[in-house]
């Protein structure tokens, strides 16, 4: 009770205490340590301390508040207090009586926080007490919210900082690190081995990668070497170019020289046969260039009349081997065979009869004997001296120069299979070195220069010697 009396006296003495009480009676009394004070206690103490003080019968707290405000001149506060006393005295009394001073002063402050604020506008003093509690609640809420907000904000800031540091650190560190590593690797790769540098950066197993590269390189090198080996096989197949030696068989093109020999025979026939044999011999001569292309056999057959100026006028039943026969023919021609190249044994291919020398050739005139280097056949009769026929190589001793020029050089060509005039079989391509036995001759029927029949020659007896003038068409022997 003493404390309550002292507190009421201080309200009338101290303006600050009075202002706090008028503003918030409940909070001011709670701050002064006055808790659980009943309204009738306030009324009796005030009446004893301040004589003549009338607090009213309804709300002694409101009457005390109004008296303190009037004492210090708080006119506005007095008006508010009066309104509160008129409107809310009963409510405050009921609450104080029913709930109690503790609920109104201590617990009611936090419990009636927001309600006190609304109630203060209409209920005056009670609302002010509740408003005190509301202010405490607001302060508590502000402190809690500020503290929690600060902590949450700080936490957020810390989290943001961590995130920023982590992000920047990760991005910058990783980016720069990767960039630096990549730059170093690229620089090292540019300066040194690319595979070793990259493998070293990838880790310890990078050495295995390098070894793998070496293995791959070895394998590739081995593979390339194998390819080179195969290429060397191709080089060996270049030895197949030795198959080009098969072109040596082109030396059988030498047998095409036999065609040239046939050409020469055609010229010889042109010289010897003159007017009548001119046409027959000209055809072999004109077709001679074609003989080098492979028509030589046919040209030789067409020049049968020219081919007749062979040996002693006796056909050889065995055709000359054209494999190297052309060479033999040229050798005999070089030996000074009368009748030129046409006098070679190749003349037998044409199928002509040497008996022309005994009939038509005799009309050309000559005083010498034509042997052509062939052993005459013994018939029991001595062959008369026949006419002299000048071939492309001159006379016996080469006294007279050849009338016609040598045939133009022919390009060697592959020899065509040649058939004989009689049997139509291909000529033998290999040279025959066995001597030819002279056949027995009978008197054949008379053949013309242009007779190129394909019947086999008929055996005949040697003709009787006939003496003919030795002057030819131009007044020279043999012509």
Swiss-Prot record:
This is Isoniazid-induced protein IniB. The gene is iniB. Induction: Specifically induced by a broad range of inhibitors of cell wall biosynthesis, including antibiotics that inhibit the synthesis of peptidoglycan (ampicillin), arabinogalactam (ethambutol), mycolic acids (isoniazid, ethionamide) and fatty acids (5-chloropyrazinamide). Down-regulated by the nucleoid-associated protein Lsr2. It comes from Mycobacterium tuberculosis (strain ATCC 25618 / H37Rv). InterPro entries: IniB-like_N (IPR049709). Residues 416-464 are annotated as: Disordered.
């Amino acid at each position: 009770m003493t404390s309550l009396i002292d507190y009421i006296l201080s309200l009338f003495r101290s303006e600050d205490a009075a202002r706090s009480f008028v503003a918030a009676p409940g909070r001011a009394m709670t701050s002064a340590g006055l808790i659980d004070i009943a309204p009738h206690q306030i009324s009796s103490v005030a009446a004893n301390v301040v004589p003549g003080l009338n607090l009213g019968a309804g709300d002694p707290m409101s009457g005390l508040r109004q008296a303190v405000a009037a004492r210090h001149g708080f006119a506005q506060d007095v008006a508010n207090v009066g309104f509160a006393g008129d409107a809310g005295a009963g409510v405050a009394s009921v609450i104080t009586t029913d709930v109690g001073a503790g609920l109104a002063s201590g617990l009611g402050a936090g419990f009636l926080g927001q309600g006190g604020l609304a109630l203060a506008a209409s209920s005056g003093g009670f609302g002010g007490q509740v408003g005190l509690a509301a202010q405490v609640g607001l302060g508590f809420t502000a402190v809690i919210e500020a503290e929690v907000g600060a902590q949450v904000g700080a936490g957020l800031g810390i989290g943001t900082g961590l995130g920023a540091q982590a992000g920047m650190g990760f991005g910058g560190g990783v980016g720069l690190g990767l960039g630096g590593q990549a730059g170093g690797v690229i620089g090292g790769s540019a300066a040194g081995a690319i595979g070793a540098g990259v493998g070293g950066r990838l880790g310890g197993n990078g050495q295995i990668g390098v070894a793998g590269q070496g293995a791959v390189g070895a394998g590739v090198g081995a593979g390339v070497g194998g390819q080179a080996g195969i290429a060397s096989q191709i080089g060996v197949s270049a030895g197949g170019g030795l198959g080009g030696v098969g072109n040596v068989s082109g030396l059988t093109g030498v047998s095409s020289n036999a065609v040239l020999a046939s050409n020469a025979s055609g010229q010889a026939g042109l010289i010897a046969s003159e007017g009548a044999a001119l046409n027959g011999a000209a055809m072999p001569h004109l077709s001679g260039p074609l003989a080098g292309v492979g028509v030589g056999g046919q040209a030789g057959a067409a020049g049968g009349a020219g081919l007749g100026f062979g040996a002693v006028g006796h056909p050889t039943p065995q055709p000359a081997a054209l494999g190297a026969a052309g060479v033999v023919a040229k050798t005999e021609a070089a030996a000074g065979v009368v009748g030129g190249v046409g006098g070679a044994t190749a003349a037998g291919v044409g199928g002509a009869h040497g008996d022309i020398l005994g009939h038509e050739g005799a009309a050309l005139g000559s005083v010498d004997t034509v042997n052509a280097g062939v052993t005459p056949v013994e018939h029991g009769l001595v062959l008369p001296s026949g006419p002299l026929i000048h071939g492309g190589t001159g006379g016996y001793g080469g006294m007279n120069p050849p009338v016609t020029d040598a045939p133009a050089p022919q390009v060697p060509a592959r020899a065509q299979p040649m058939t004989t005039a009689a049997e139509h079989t291909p000529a033998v391509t290999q040279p025959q070195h066995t001597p030819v036995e002279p056949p027995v001759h009978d008197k054949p029927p008379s053949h013309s220069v242009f007779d190129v029949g394909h019947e086999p020659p008929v055996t005949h007896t040697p003709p009787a010697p006939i003496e003919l003038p030795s002057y030819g068409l131009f007044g020279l022997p043999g012509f």
